Amino acid sequence: MVIGTGLAGRVIADALRGPEVTLAGFLSADLPPDGWPYPVLGAPEDAPGLSRDGRGFIVAADSLKDREAVVRAFPELGYQAVIHPAAHVAADAVVEPGAYIGAGAVVGTGASIGAHSVIGEGSIVGALSRIEPYCELLARVNIGHEVTVKDHTFIGHSATLKDKITIAAGTVIQTGEIVVKDMVMKMVYKRGAWIYKENGPGER
């Protein structure tokens, strides 16, 4: 089951159309958009009761902050990763519960994707790289090999991270940026320069 009926929910539903999985429906605190093509079975508060038959869940929130809020509200749910059939994930890569891997994405050998993180369409996570929980990579992000992206980091479309660097928790990297060195505190990277941000979890 998918919690959330925004754009992220529609994207995840597309990944669940294959013959090996069944999309039971959606839970949403709000009315779904007009023309929503999938069944809405209740609100997020109904999830614990619906989980008793072994259903898996994934949170489809359109921001990192909202995604984490749902998981914290319902930590007991059986969260499952969703990998789009058109993605390629190496046999020894690790994808933790609640993560989503989009169409055309590549996760290299020995890489790991943290719980409730999102790897957007066409993004590449290189060999032995680690994406920690609650990160979001938009489409066509290129992560080199042996890179560590710490929790609550947001990376915009088509950004590139050089091999063997570490990005601090809560960092925001804007669309199209190229990052070639470590970032040791929470920052925004924009137009080739780091801009200081206060410590604490990142938001988008």
Regions found by a protein language model. Name each.
Residues 1, 23-24, 53-58:
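Short active-site oxyanion
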Residues 1-16:
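Glycine-rich adenosine-cofactor-binding loop
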Residues 13-15, 69-73, 185:
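Short amphipathic alpha-helical segments
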Residues 19-35:
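NAD(P)-binding Rossmann-fold cofactor-contacting core
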Residues 31-88:
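Phosphate-bearing ligand-interacting subdomains
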Residues 63-73, 77-132, 140-147, 159-161, ...:
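Left-handed beta-helix
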Residues 133, 139-204:
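Glycine-rich hexapeptide-repeat left-handed beta-helix
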